[in-house]
Curated annotation (Swiss-Prot):
Coiled-coil regions, chain positions: none
Source organism of this protein record: Lactiplantibacillus plantarum (strain ATCC BAA-793 / NCIMB 8826 / WCFS1) (Lactobacillus plantarum)
Residues that bind ATP: D87, W88, L89
The protein, known as: Probable ketoamine kinase lp_1983
Catalytic activity: N(6)-(D-ribulosyl)-L-lysine + ATP = N(6)-(3-O-phospho-D-ribulosyl)-L-lysine + ADP + H(+); N-(D-ribulosyl)-cadaverine + ATP = N-(3-O-phospho-D-ribulosyl)-cadaverine + ADP + H(+); N(6)-(D-erythrulosyl)-L-lysine + ATP = N(6)-(3-O-phospho-D-erythrulosyl)-L-lysine + ADP + H(+); N-(D-erythrulosyl)-cadaverine + ATP = N-(3-O-phospho-D-erythrulosyl)-cadaverine + ADP + H(+)
Top-rank EC class of the record's enzyme: transferase
GO molecular function, one term: kinase activity
Enzyme Commission numbers on file: 2.7.1.-
Similarity-based family: Belongs to the fructosamine kinase family.
Length: 280
């Protein structure tokens, strides 16, 4: 995507000196903007209005109340494109222990119910966040079922997968009384690409997809693609111990993220989905 001078002139910035594309995202166009006195990170969603970024802004503010996140400068619409303007953060190195403590601090933020005060349906994977008092109901109906139905639409589902998924779903609902869950604020997409360390070594959480749910969902995501080491888990456990049996529950939460990748990237993730489904 090319940003014209006319487009850039509508940003709430003065004296823009340089604009550099930034790689790494597959959803938004991203740029580093350098002015005379400051640097900014700009996300642009082509042909999508400002509401596309409302969910991310809300998430950054919720997380930012208890841990470091990029500061939101502005969001809006230019021409037909939604944009989100953030502070540019120079990166450094930091400790996994500090990251684990930061995530635990986020999870200590609780709510009376599971969900969020708004849905997010502008992306490729709809997030239905209607409030629920029962976690198993929320997770099966508003997370897993949504992605399974999407996989069916994408012709990525089979009778075998449906049979095993039905068994998993029933077990989650039947066994919900065995696992007491307190609604925690979740990052929602906690993989290694969504944290960094600033130049002081402070952990920074980015690109959130927040809601209130079982904190083991965030922890499950950390186990799928790597990027979190023993120090992270030890620091997390010291700050907010997990309930016994978490290792047995993690696959059912890993399934959500693997279903997301199945829908986004296709059958490459099918074997990983099947490995979990076949346990039921």
């Amino acid at each position: 995507m090319h940003l014209t001078k006319t487009w850039l002139a509508q940003l709430p910035l003065t004296d823009i000196q340089q604009v550099q594309p930034v790689s790494g995202g597959d959803i938004n166009a991203a740029f580093q903007i350098i002015t005379r006195h400051h640097q900014y990170f700009l996300k642009v969603q082509p042909h999508n209005d400002v509401t596309f970024f409302d969910h991310e802004v809300a998430g950054l503010r919720l997380l930012g109340a208890v841990t470091k996140t990029p500061r939101v400068i502005a969001s809006g619409t230019i021409a037909t494109d939604g944009y989100l303007l953030l502070d540019w953060l120079a990166t450094g190195t930091g400790s996994q222990s500090a990251l684990g403590a930061a995530v635990a601090k986020v999870h200590h933020q609780h709510h009376a119910q599971f969900g969020l005060d708004h849905d997010f349906t502008a992306g490729k994977l709809p997030k239905i966040n209607h409030w629920q008092t029962d976690w198993a109901t929320f997770y099966t109906q508003q997370r897993l079922d949504v992605l399974v139905n999407l996989a069916k639409e994408h012709h990525l589902w089979s009778e075998t997968r449906e049979m095993h998924y039905h068994r998993l779903r029933q077990q989650l609902l039947q066994d919900s009384h065995m696992h007491t869950v307190k609604p925690s604020l979740l990052h929602g997409d906690l993989w290694s690409g969504n944290y960094l360390f600033d130049t002081t070594g402070t952990p920074v959480l980015i690109d959130p997809d927040v809601f209130y749910g079982d904190r083991e969902m965030d922890l499950a995501m950390t186990t799928i693609f790597g990027g979190f080491d023993t120090d992270f888990y030890q620091a997390y456990q010291a700050a907010y111990p997990v309930a016994p049996g978490m290792q047995d529950r993690l696959p059912s939460y890993q399934l959500y993220y693997l279903l997301a990748h199945l829908n986004l990237f296709g059958e490459t993730y099918g074997p990983a989905v099947d490995r979990i489904l076949m346990q039921y």
